Amino acid sequence: MAVFHDEVEIEDFQYDEDSETYFYPCPCGDNFSITKEDLENGEDVATCPSCSLIIKVIYDKDQFMCGETVPAPSTNKELVKC
């Protein structure tokens, strides 16, 4: 079980459009970071690369759902013999 240093709303993070990464200041002087892709995949833990602290990111997962669509199953019911 992870012990979070803090829980922080995504709105409090700084967003870098070039790297598609969210940053939040860490007490050690570096930044916690989490990518947009991580959020789209349901991740909610931002890490600091300079120390062992982690924070829980509070965000609406529905807003970060990946835009991928899954095709409907085929309705072709023809069976193929092996």
UniProtKB/Swiss-Prot annotation:
Q: Where in the cell is it found?
A: Cytoplasm; Nucleus
Catalytic reaction equation(s): [3Fe-4S](1+)-[protein] + Fe(2+)-[Dph3] = [3Fe-4S](0)-[protein] + Fe(3+)-[Dph3]; 2 [3Fe-4S](0)-[protein] + 2 Fe(2+)-[Dph3] + NADH = 2 [4Fe-4S](1+)-[protein] + 2 [Dph3] + NAD(+) + H(+)
Question: Know anything about its domains from the record?
Answer: The DPH-type metal-binding (MB) domain can also bind zinc. However, iron is the physiological binding partner as zinc binding impairs the protein electron donor function.
**Metal-binding is among the record's keywords:** yes
How it assembles, according to the record, is: Component of the 2-(3-amino-3-carboxypropyl)histidine synthase complex composed of DPH1, DPH2, DPH3 and a NADH-dependent reductase. Interacts with SERGEF.
Task of the protein: Required for the first step of diphthamide biosynthesis, a post-translational modification of histidine which occurs in elongation factor 2. DPH1 and DPH2 transfer a 3-amino-3-carboxypropyl (ACP) group from S-adenosyl-L-methionine (SAM) to a histidine residue, the reaction is assisted by a reduction system comprising DPH3 and a NADH-dependent reductase. Acts as an electron donor to reduce the Fe-S cluster in DPH1-DPH2 keeping the [4Fe-4S] clusters in the active and reduced state.
Which species expresses this protein natively?
A: Cricetulus griseus
Coiled coil location: none
Q: Which GO terms describe its biological process?
A: negative regulation of protein secretion; positive regulation of binding; protein histidyl modification to diphthamide; tRNA wobble base 5-methoxycarbonylmethyl-2-thiouridinylation
Record SUPFAM superfamilies: CSL zinc finger
**Family, per the entry?**
Belongs to the DPH3 family.
Source species, domain of life: Eukaryota
Report the InterPro entries cross-referenced here. Answer: DPH3/4-like, DPH_MB_dom, DPH_MB_sf
Its cofactor is:
Fe(2+)
Domain named DPH-type MB: residues: 4-60
What is this protein identified as?
Diphthamide biosynthesis protein 3
Q: Which GO terms describe its cellular component?
A: cytoplasm; nucleus
List the pathway annotation. Answer: Protein modification; peptidyl-diphthamide biosynthesis
Print the keywords alphabetically.
Answer: Cytoplasm, Iron, Metal-binding, Nucleus
Q: Which GO terms describe its molecular function?
A: ferrous iron binding; iron chaperone activity
